[in-house]
């Protein structure tokens, strides 16, 4: 993993940054080895490599995330990596759930919203049009409810964590027009 990190330049994106799964050869390619952040990961972060969650159905491990965050390697962007195979994976039903996991890790509502909106837009050089509600922007909005109360989270390695709050999607607005129905189900805490 260190060899790969050393090749990344400022602005390059390392997604699945907190993965706990091995690669196709069976080697673990985590930025954390034996509880310690790889020096190459911190060096990449310091030179401007973007660290993206990319949760998906197999790429988020609490033990990797907690160690990396504690040792100074915070995520820049939150993405779900949702696709046909990951959408029904335990622990990863939708983007707001991934955002909620990071609130449970100590990030504020403002931080997780920025990591899922304005920061990704900046990474792909699409500000102020994307990730913004400025005049002239497309008017794409995800309306969420902050639900307080005990909630259980699980990662893709079946590590469990308890939280006190989660985000529930309520309505989507695309190009200024409400899209679909207001969400009631299946977005319920299980």
Give residue ranges: language-model regions:
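Histidine/acidic residue-rich metal-binding segments in metalloenzymes
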Residues: 1-51, 59-76
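Active-site metal-binding loops of divalent metal-dependent hydrolases
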Residues: 19, 56, 82
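Glycine/Thr-rich phosphate-binding loops of Rossmann-like dinucleotide-binding domains
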Residues: 23-24, 88, 152, 182
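P-loop/Walker A phosphate-binding loop and immediately adjacent motor/lid segment at beta-alpha junctions
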Residues: 30-53, 98-105, 156-178
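Residue-level marker of alpha-helix boundaries and capping positions
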Residues: 31, 55-56, 89-90
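His/Asp/Glu-enriched, well-ordered alpha-helical/loop segment
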Residues: 61-146
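C-terminal cap of metal-dependent C-N hydrolases
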Residues: 138-190
């Amino acid at each position: 993993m260190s060899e790969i990190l050393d090749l990344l330049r400022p602005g390059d994106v390392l997604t699945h940054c907190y993965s706990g799964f091995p690669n196709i050869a069976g080697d673990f390619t985590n930025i954390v080895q034996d509880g310690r952040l790889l020096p190459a990961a911190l060096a990449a972060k310091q030179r401007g490599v973007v660290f993206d969650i990319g949760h998906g159905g197999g790429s988020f491990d609490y033990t990797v995330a907690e160690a990396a965050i504690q040792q100074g390697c915070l995520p820049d962007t939150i993405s779900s990596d949702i696709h046909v195979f990951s959408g029904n994976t335990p622990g990863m039903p939708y983007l707001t759930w991934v955002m909620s996991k990071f609130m449970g890790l100590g990030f504020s509502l403002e931080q997780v919203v920025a990591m899922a909106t304005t920061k990704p837009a900046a990474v792909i050089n699409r500000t102020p049009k994307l990730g913004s509600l400025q005049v002239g922007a497309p008017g794409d909005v995800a309306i969420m409810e902050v639900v307080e109360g005990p909630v259980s989270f699980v990662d893709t390695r079946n590590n469990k964590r308890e939280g006190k709050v989660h985000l529930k999607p309520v309505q989507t607005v695309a190009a200024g027009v409400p899209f679909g129905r207001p969400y009631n189900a299946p977005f319920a805490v299980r």
